[in-house]
Amino acid sequence: MLGVEMYPGLALGPQRLSDCYYRDRDVPLYPSTCEMAARALPPALLKPHANTDSPATPQDSVRMELENAGLWKQFSTVGTEMIVTKKGRRMFPQLRVKLSGLNPSLRYILLLDIVPVDSSRYRFQDNSWQVVGGAEARLPDRVFIHPDSPATGEHWQNRTISFHRAKLTNNTLDAQGYIILHSLHRYQPRVHVIEARDVLMWGRTQHSFTFPETQFITVTAYQNNKITELKINSNPFAKGFRENGMNCKKQREARLKRKITSSQEECLDIESCDPCDSTELLPQSVDLPSSALTIMNTALPITDSGFHTEVSSHPDQTDSDQTLVLEQAFLTSEMPSSMESQQQTTSETNVNNALMDETGQMMDLSGYTSSFPTPQLSSHTSVPQSSSMYSVVSSTQSSDLELPQASSISSPHSMPAYSSIPSAEYPGVNSSTAMPASTTSLSDSYPSISHSTSSHLLQSSSYHSLLPTDQSQDNLSPHTPTNPPFQSIPACQGTRLTIDSGQNQVDDGGLSSANATTPAVPNPTQTAFPFPPVQPNNDPDPTSPSCQSLPQSALPYQQVSQCNQIPTPSDPNTTPTAFPFPPSEQSTPNSIMVSSNPNTTAFPFPPVQQQLNLSTSGPSSFPVSQSSGLNAIPNPVHPTTGSFSFPSTSAIHQGPMQSVPNTLHPSTAYTFPSSLPKHTGPLPNPAPTSYPFPTPIPPGPHPLQSLTLPSSCSIPNTSQIQSTFPQSYHNPSFSHIPPQMANHSQITSQSFPPLQTSSAPQLLSQSSTHPQCPPPSNAYPAVAPTEIGTFPQLNSAAPYLPDVVLHPSILPSLDPSLSSSAPPSLYNPFPSYSLRLCQDPRSSLHLPLRHIYRQPQHAHGQGSYFDLGGRTVF
């Protein structure tokens, strides 16, 4: 049972070396080197050691007392029960004894064993333990050795000896050394005191002590409630179960109730808490890097209607002027304090009415009716050139997708409000309700230059019209130094391009006077606006009087932001505006000298990666998003040679953009969307405007077809307009377009469904708007017209005014128009485009609009953009 190997420190008596021989002396606890050497020698063989050395004190002198006898007696009167478990359970009450009469110099070992009292099995019934049968087979006896053993008699006598560490188990296969007992049997603990040297000796006596009050019955659960109460009250470790303890029944129930309540509250909190959505609008004055803007545009989830799910739509948009304060994230790194969003009245119709319900793919459908505060002199709204040319396209994800009806497309009743509004309050991107990606493709590469006005513009649209206000308009360019030599044109302040939905009239200059009734706009100042990928013919045919000043917006959206475009009548000379595109990475502040004297206002359009510094004094730069056409660029009646340098799509020009001046025949006229209202009065003195576009277009004069733009009412239909454009661009930069298709009319026969402005039924049919526009040679792929035009939601139910011809046949089905103008080879794979459109914008965003989010810095040609699933996209 006890071996020396278990306790190497035990000083044993004479050890038996063989049957009859013992070592003559005890083995020292720590033998010395000499002893070890002597031990190597053969030991002296002696007869068995005679047991003559009896203990110094008589055997009966050793006494043991049960220290906690009172507690044991208290339990024994009721009937002590001890819990046994598979894992082992300590005893309570504990065995606490006190020894006396030991030899202080001798070492002793204390052992505990538990033996059955009888051979019966018990059951607790009728509040007493009764014998119910014979005992189970006796288990091998196990002994618990006190941890202090071996210890001298002095050690044991000077302290209370407790066997509290002994554990009882009913696991017959226990390997932990616990005492194995049967449940429902009666047992008696015993304590043995043995001299350490006598452990292995025969015939030596040991002292065993038993206490009748320590008998107990083993149970797996307390049977007698009195025992339970005694144990709870007596056991310091069970005080939690007492009446005033933490584990009492009352406390347990209370804790359980609190736990259930807290869990329910947590569930409610989880349900009620607002979701952490990255789509939430960024606070104003947030400096968005171009990459962040791109990510935001691409990653934001789009709801079915293409709006932020988080965005709360203004519930009651009524005729009454409602102040709409948009907390739109500004794309500007620096926002002057004056750029706080101003209240602006919105037209009665809701954005939801104008916007397509399920066309979430039309990223830039919505314009904001946000009033733009007057730009400060040194207001530098540095519009980061988002690396993704289409970061602006996801404008619909902006919080309140309100078509900027107030200024750009102001319903007749709303016009008066704007008549008095300073030019700075022109919502940019007003009419760009649903810009095809093609129109908005440039917006990202050429961040629309928005002064403070950009605050309310859709981020993705980034259509920031530079609308000078009554304030000194010297620095209109977001990046221009605080004191650039810009002369403000005060007279233009009241004027703003407004599409009177009621009248369906857009002032020819695209600029309606504050009353929008100005019969004749004298010399419209050539306003510079970033040119969208589609470059329409620069000059309207001088012969077309009514259309002479039609805004050269092939864009379906009339830019309202064109305030100050009409120089005061006193300005006999229209200021020619040259739009040089600065090389990428260069932000060139453009000092636009707009004065009575014609000043060429150079609008450098930086390639992608550049911050556009459009400083338009009077004229407000039009968001590039309206790339499909030069929006509201008053095309002087006089022929103007405009050199269009188209940026090569494949490469971003790090150096200055090579602009191969393409001389435009003076006769070239910009086709205006049929929906555009005819200009009330001809502009007497159009100023020649040169539009240098980055050149992917091969050098060489491109004879822009001298298109005589009839008044909007006279514009019969897009087919007519397209036919009128004989312009053939040599070697179009589009890889997917065969050279024979370079003819502009062929390529741009795309019919875009008219986007109905939220305020009025006026529809700007993009098909008429864009057909004349040459396919953008810029590296900004336009959204395939097929993806836009085929949305039935885009077709507004509002009828065209009599002066505008609606072509229902073109709107519902693009094939006939496409086949007539464009080679069928382009569209053969997809006879029905509407079928390919997914109603769920999320699922369809990846492929159809993938090109919108592509980075413009790609080194490869445009082919990758346009070859989307076998579908050619312009």
UniProtKB/Swiss-Prot annotation:
UniProt keywords, alphabetically: Developmental protein, DNA-binding, Nucleus, Transcription, Transcription regulation
Recorded GO molecular functions are: DNA-binding transcription factor activity, RNA polymerase II-specific; RNA polymerase II cis-regulatory region sequence-specific DNA binding
Q: Which GO terms describe its biological process?
A: anterior/posterior pattern specification; blood vessel morphogenesis; cell fate specification; morphogenesis of embryonic epithelium; positive regulation of DNA-templated transcription; regulation of skeletal muscle tissue development; regulation of transcription by RNA polymerase II; somatic motor neuron differentiation
Highest taxon of source = Eukaryota
The keyword Transcription is annotated on this UniProt entry = yes
Q: Kindly indicate where the leader peptide sits in this chain.
A: none
The protein here is known as T-box transcription factor TBX6
Q: Which organism is it from?
A: Danio rerio (Zebrafish)
